[in-house]
Regions:
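Alpha-helix initiation and N-capping motif
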Residues: 59, 63, 77-81, 97, ...
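A glycine/threonine-rich phosphate-anchoring loop and its flanking beta-alpha core
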Residues: 1-89
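Active-site segments that bind and position negatively charged phosphate/pyrophosphate groups
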Residues: 83-198
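Anionic group-transfer/hydrolysis microenvironments
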Residues: 14, 52, 127, 137, ...
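C-terminal charged capping/lid subdomain of soluble metabolic enzymes
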Residues: 67-69, 171-248
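A secondary-structure boundary/capping signal
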Residues: 11-12, 126, 219
Length: 248
């Protein structure tokens, strides 16, 4: 990278950047319409998180961050999920800063154990296999300022991957329905059709998380408990997309 690596200090000003993008040391750029296809690992020297920036954000931008916070709860802490869910559904309610720092702590716990993303850190990818495919496709068919946001794409991905979790990882029907209900608003606000499996498959096959020719997922066993290194068939992924499509 430039000058063999530069020291960097980050001051995230969006909720998504505070709870996710600024920590963990991953950098990435989109390439040939694939999400984060080129990147490296480089930790910031310092990260200054100031929640006072948040009142300047539109609600759509806040929702992007809430989705990643919901994900942190879904994979590791049910009580955190329940607390964030309240704020996500009550968009005019001020966000408790302690929830921001707890989300950061959940991510850091995974990163510290597995900086290079070869094991437990993969659990942070819940929702992102489908989410990145949806986001990449949207970038192709839409102008950049009209394309599906990262938070919305990951939220939709979490619906599909929760369905897959119910088929492969033992997620209960009650948990699946609860997650779906919380994320229903994202589905309702989507201003484009859910792409077919044929359209999404090239993006899924190029996902950087894959091992050999298999499409790799991190899946929920229950709310607050996630495991990594599942693979799903094309047929099952298509079922998950149908499940999402029927919610619109």
């Amino acid at each position: 990278c430039y000058q063999r690596g530069m020291r960097v200090v980050l001051v995230p000003t969006s909720l998504l950047a505070m709870v996710d993008a600024s920590s963990g040391g991953k950098t990435g750029v989109n390439f040939l319409n694939f999400k984060n296809y080129i990147g490296l690992f480089k930790e910031a020297e310092e990260i200054f998180v100031c929640p006072d920036f948040l009142p300047t954000l539109p609600q759509a931008e806040m929702r992007n961050g809430y989705v990643e916070m919901l994900k942190h709860g879904l994979i590791a802490d049910k009580s955190h999920y329940d607390a964030v869910k309240y704020h996500f559904l009550k968009s005019n309610h001020p966000l408790d800063p302690s929830l921001i720092f707890h989300s950061i702590a959940i991510k850091q716990q995974h990163v510290e154990q597995d900086f290079l993303d070869t094991g437990i850190r993969k659990r942070l990818n819940f929702g992102h296999t489908i989410g990145h495919a949806l986001e990449s496709h949207s970038l192709v068919i839409k102008e950049e300022n009209e394309s599906l946001s990262h938070g919305a794409a990951v939220g939709l991905g979490m619906v599909v991957e929760s369905y897959i979790s119910a088929q492969l990882a033992g997620l209960s029907e009650d948990d699946l329905q609860q997650i779906t209900l919380v994320l229903q608003g994202l589905v309702n606000s989507m201003n484009e059709d859910i792409p077919s499996m044929d359209v999404l498959l090239p993006y899924l096959q190029k996902d950087k998380k894959n091992q050999s020719a298999e499409i790799n997922f991190s899946l929920l066993k229950s709310i607050g408990h996630c495991e990594h290194n599942y693979t799903a068939s094309v047929e099952l992924i298509a079922e998950g997309l149908d499940f999402l499509r029927k919610l619109k």
